[in-house]
Structures are given as C-alpha cells and as structure tokens.
Design a protein with these regions (language model features):
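Phosphate/NTP-binding elements of NTP-utilizing enzymes
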Residues: 1-184
Length: 184
C-alpha cells in the first residue's frame, strides 16, 4: 500500500500560523483567531479538520455567516498561489470523496463527513451531531448558532474554531476577550 503524506509536503504553515496549528494539534478545543484578510485562516482550519476526520470518525462543519456564501468562499474558492480549488488541495482524492450537490466530503477509510453550511440557518441542523465546527468570518455570523451548537460540541468532546477579521466591538470581540481572560 502506498504511503500518503498528509498534510501534503508542499503545504507549509506561515510563521504566524504555527501557534494556532500547534494548539489545535495538541488537542485544543476552543480557538479564537482574529487575523487580517488573506492570512490563511480558512486554510489552517481546513487542514486541521481534514486531519481530525482521519483520526476521529465524526461529523465536521465549516460555517460561514450565510449559506449562499459557502459555495463561493470555500467550496469553489481557488488558491491564488497554486491555481487549485482549496477543497481539492486539502481533501485529496486518495483519502476523501466529494459530493458537489450538497458540498459534502466523506472520508474513504471511516465514517467522517465534512460539510459547508451557513450560520443563518443553524436551526436546520436539528438532530445533527458535529464534533468540530469552524465558524469562518465569525464577526459576521449569527451569534445564536454558537449557543445552540455548544451543548452538542460539549457532549461530543469536540472543538470549535472561531476565525475572523476584526470588525469592531461585536460578539466576536466579546468571545475573543473571554478567551484572552480564560485561555484554558
């Protein structure tokens, strides 16, 4: 059986991403990441999620503020450095299969799934059991999604990553300040 390098050998963390990556790889369960635009927030979160999918069979979500943003911003987004779709770079065909109609990725060697959804319609997730959620552009998301989904994450001993660009003093500012005060 061939050996598959994952994450890919040609993918490298930027220096400022290393602290977040190390925290997540050490089992960190709550990350607040407020970085500038084009800093690779989603990229780090996608690779972490893919690694988690391979290790722990479960459901994982990547959430943007609006459901109609997800296809453009994540599912069809092309990495300007490589010219490849981000989901194709991260979720390689040797390990994952893609279902375009509902933006779903399945792990080939266990039952893990990853799906893109919008926080504007989090109520539609009734009965779902995500173990990991990335809240992309958290400052623009519906903050009620976090409260609704937090008990599910806790029950599943899961994790949440809140990634965003600064957008003033709003719910993202509040959750970031709370994380600074309680880093554990």
């Amino acid at each position: 059986m061939p050996v598959i390098d994952f994450p890919r050998k040609d993918w490298a963390l930027r220096p400022y991403q290393k602290e977040l990556w190390d925290y997540l790889c050490a089992g960190g369960r709550h990350a607040e990441c407020v970085w500038h635009r084009r800093a690779g927030k989603d990229e780090v979160a996608l690779y972490h999620t893919a690694c988690e999918m391979l290790e722990t069979p479960a459901n994982y979500w990547h959430m943007l503020p609006k459901g109609n943003q997800v296809r453009k911003a994540i599912w069809e987004a092309v990495n300007p450095r490589t010219g490849k779709r981000r989901v194709d770079e991260v979720f390689i065909p040797e390990l994952f299969e893609k279902r375009d109609t509902d933006m779903l990725i399945k792990c080939k060697h266990n039952a893990s799934t990853w799906q893109c959804i919008g926080s504007d319609n989090y109520e539609a997730s009734i009965g779902s059991t995500p173990r990991g959620i990335v809240y992309s552009e958290w400052a623009l998301a519906n903050p009620s999604a976090r409260g609704y989904l937090r008990p599910i994450i806790a029950e599943n001993k899961g994790w949440q990553i809140f990634i965003t660009t600064p957008r003033g003093k709003n719910h993202a500012y509040s959750t970031y300040q709370a994380a600074v005060k309680n880093p554990n």
